């Protein structure tokens, strides 16, 4: 089991070697350039992750994507052209656990306040938080710059998107030993395999009905295997905490 963060130097070096394949995220296709306006790239010259713009000055990501000297790129499609993007720095970061001692199955969430707001544009727009939890069986969208092949990773350089299903949590418990009976995560994937979030997609969104329902957290060492779904932090369970922090209540606590 691995967190789906990526060594970004490797990603950048491999951009020109990406393969054209119908098995492109793994099992996806290149996103429409206007489809991922909320998606952001977190990068510090060593590691890369994704995040999601949820209003003009706040980004939601995974706490395991926290890194020093990070820059936040908005409006990016092709990573080789990221210097044409809007660039922001984190002004403040907020975690559910002050020591960031998260577990694989709980509280892998980070809220970042940008040093200055961004304007909505053709390529940049915030994504709404969920109004209710997604139902099992819902078809949701994943996206990112992560590997499109696994276990020998190939990175595409441009954003890829795919559809997956919200699966019963029992499917994830059957796939990964030691999970608790309940968790503030969503189990997502395709039971037959072939499609799924992969190395480099960490922190990115799981989008259902136009709302941000999940944050890419962790999955199997080899991506998109049958009966090996990915775990996504369940954003709905943290909406009160998120909204309280944004409103200025920095002492707000996460759900237990």
Swiss-Prot record:
Cystine pairs: 31-161, 49-65, 96-254, 140-208, 172-187, 198-223
Compartment list: Secreted
Domain Peptidase S1: 25-247
Subunit structure: Monomer.
Active site, renumbered: 64 (charge relay system), 108 (charge relay system), 202 (charge relay system)
Entry EC no(s): 3.4.21.-
Family annotation (InterPro entries): Peptidase_S1_PA, Peptidase_S1_PA_chymotrypsin, Peptidase_S1A, Trypsin_dom, TRYPSIN_SER
Function description: Snake venom serine protease that has fibrinogenolytic activities by hydrolyzing the beta chain of fibrinogen (FGB). Typical arginine esterase which hydrolyzes esters and amides of arginine.
Gene3D superfamilies in the cross-refs: Trypsin-like serine proteases
Keyword Secreted carried by entry: yes
Main EC class the enzyme belongs to: hydrolase
Signal sequence bounds: 1-18
Major localization listed first in the record, in broad terms: secreted
Protein name: Beta-fibrinogenase-like
Glycosylation sites: 44, 78, 101, 152
Maturation propeptide residues: 19-24
Record key words, sorted: Disulfide bond, Fibrinogenolytic toxin, Glycoprotein, Hemostasis impairing toxin, Hydrolase, Protease, Secreted, Serine protease, Signal, Toxin, Zymogen
Family: Belongs to the peptidase S1 family. Snake venom subfamily.
Gene Ontology CC entries for this record: extracellular region; secretory granule
Tissue and organ distribution: Expressed by the venom gland.
GO biological process: proteolysis
GO molecular function per UniProt: serine-type endopeptidase activity; toxin activity
Protein's organism: Daboia siamensis
């Amino acid at each position: 089991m691995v967190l789906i963060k990526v060594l970004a130097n490797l990603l950048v070096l491999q951009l020109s070697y990406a393969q054209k394949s119908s098995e492109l995220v793994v099992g996806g296709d290149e996103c429409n350039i206007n489809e991922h306006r909320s998606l952001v790239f977190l990068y510090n010259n060593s590691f890369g992750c994704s995040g999601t713009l949820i209003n003009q000055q706040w980004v939601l990501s995974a706490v395991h994507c926290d890194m020093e000297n990070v820059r936040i790129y908005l409006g990016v499609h092709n990573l080789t052209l990221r210097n044409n993007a809007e660039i922001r720095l984190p002004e403040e970061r907020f975690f559910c656990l002050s020591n960031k001692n998260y577990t694989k199955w709980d509280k892998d969430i980070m809220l970042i306040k940008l040093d200055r707001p961004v304007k909505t544009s053709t390529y940049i727009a915030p994504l709404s938080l969920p109004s209710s939890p997604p139902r099992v069986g819902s078809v949701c969208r994943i996206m990112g710059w992560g590997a499109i092949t696994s276990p020998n990773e190939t990175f595409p350089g441009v954003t890829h998107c795919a559809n997956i299903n919200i699966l019963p949590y029992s499917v994830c418990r059957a796939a990964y030993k030691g999970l608790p009976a309940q968790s503030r995560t969503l189990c997502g994937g395709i039971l037959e395999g072939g499609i799924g979030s992969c190395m480099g997609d960490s922190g990115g969104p799981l989008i259902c009905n136009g709302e941000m329902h999940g944050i890419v957290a962790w999955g199997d060492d080899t991506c998109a295997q049958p009966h090996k779904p990915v775990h996504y932090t369940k954003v709905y369970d943290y909406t009160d905490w998120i909204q309280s922090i944004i409103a200025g209540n920095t002492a707000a606590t996460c759900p237990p």
